[in-house]
A protein has these predicted regions:
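His/Glu-based metal-binding/catalytic segments typifying zinc-dependent metallopeptidases
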Residues: 1, 141, 170-231
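Charge-rich, well-structured scaffold segments of protease-associated domains
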Residues: 3-172, 239-268
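Internal amphipathic alpha-helical segments of the cytochrome P450 catalytic fold
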Residues: 154, 230-234
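Extended hydrophobic-aromatic, low-complexity segments
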Residues: 211-214, 232-233, 246-247, 268
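Generic hydrophobic alpha-helical scaffold/packing signal
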Residues: 222-225, 234, 238, 261
Length: 268
C-alpha cells in the first residue's frame, strides 16, 4: 500500500477508488482512478496511461499470496467487517432500515446486503474469496467509462481493457432485469430497545417493475414528497404537526420500492 500511495502521489495526487454496492438484483463493483489531464503535467507525463494501468491492475491483478488473496489481509478485513456489523446495532437509524429491507425483500437477491451478514463473516476463507473473484471476472458484464480524455486516449484505454479480457475465458451472464416485490397486506414488525428516540422505517412497492419512462416523474415526486427541506413530509409532518424529529423518503428504481425513514417519540 505504501508503494501505491507513493505512485498516486507522483501522479499529482491521483485518487484510486474501489466501491461495491447492490443495484437491484445485481451487485456493482466500480474501480476508478481520477486525476488531472495529460496537458497539465509539468513534465509532459502520459498520465492517462498511468491511470489506466493502475485501474486495470487493481481490477485484474490483485495481490495474491500462493495463488489466493493474502490470508493476513483477509484476516484483517474480516475483523474490520465483523466489528462494523457488530457496531451497527448502535446506529439505530441504519439498523432499522436494514431490518426493514430484510423483511421487505425476503429471499429476493435484491435484499442481499452490501456488507453481507455477521453470521457469515467468520467462515470466509481466502480460497472462497479468490474463487468468487475469478467467477466475477468470467461472468460479469463490464462497462468502461472514460471522461475528459481525447478520442485517442480513450481508444488506448479501451484497447488495454480488451487486452486484459482476452486472457480470460469470458461467459458474461445476462443483466438482471428491474424487479418489484408483489403487493401484499401490510406487515408490521417491532423491536424494542432502551433508547430516547424511536426509529420508524416504512417500505412500499409499485407491485410491478418500473418502466424507464416513469423515472423522471418519480424523481420529481420524491423531491416533493420527502426528498428535500421543502418536501411535504418535512413541512407538514415535522414542521407543522411536530410528529417526528426527521422524516424523509427515497426511491430505488431497480426494485420499484420507496422507503420512508423517520425518528419519532416512542408514544407515536
Amino acid at each position: 500500500m505504501t508503494r501505491l500511495t507513493k505512485k498516486l502521489a507522483k501522479l499529482y495526487g491521483a485518487d484510486l477508488t474501489v466501491d461495491a454496492r447492490p443495484m437491484g438484483c445485481s451487485h456493482n463493483l466500480c474501480v476508478s482512478v481520477t486525476g488531472i489531464k495529460d496537458q497539465f503535467a509539468l513534465e509532459g507525463e502520459t498520465l492517462t496511461r498511468e491511470y489506466a494501468s493502475i485501474a486495470l491492475g487493481a481490477a485484474f491483478h490483485p495481490y495474491f499470496v500462493g495463488g489466493t488473496f493474502d490470508p493476513e489481509a483477509v484476516g484483517i478485513e474480516k475483523q474490520m467487517l465483523k466489528k462494523a456489523l457488530e457496531d451497527e446495532i448502535n446506529d439505530k437509524r441504519l439498523y432499522c432500515l436494514h431490518q426493514a429491507n430484510r423483511e421487505f425483500f425476503g429471499d429476493s437477491p435484491a435484499g442481499v446486503r452490501q456488507e453481507g451478514y455477521l453470521e457469515e463473516v467468520e467462515g470466509l476463507t481466502p480460497e472462497q474469496l479468490t474463487a468468487a473473484y475469478y467467477e466475477m471476472l468470467r461472468t460479469a458484464n463490464i462497462e468502461l467509462l472514460v471522461l475528459g480524455c481525447t478520442a485517442e486516449q480513450t481508444a488506448a484505454v479501451k484497447d488495454a481493457l480488451l487486452a486484459e479480457l482476452a486472457a480470460i475465458d469470458r461467459a458474461p451472464l445476462p443483466l438482471a432485469e428491474n424487479i418489484a416485490m408483489p403487493r401484499r397486506e401490510p406487515v408490521h414488525k417491532t423491536e424494542t430497545y432502551d433508547m430516547v428516540q424511536a426509529k420508524l422505517c416504512m417500505l412500499f412497492t409499485l407491485g410491478e417493475p418500473m418502466r424507464t419512462e416513469q423515472l423522471a416523474a418519480v424523481r420529481l415526486a420524491m423531491a416533493l414528497y420527502g426528498g428535500s427541506v421543502t418536501s411535504r413530509l418535512f413541512l407538514n409532518v415535522r414542521e407543522r404537526d411536530h410528529l417526528c424529529y426527521y422524516c424523509s423518503s427515497s426511491f430505488q428504481s431497480f426494485t420499484g420500492s420507496m422507503a420512508v425513514n423517520s425518528g419519532v417519540e416512542h408514544a407515536d
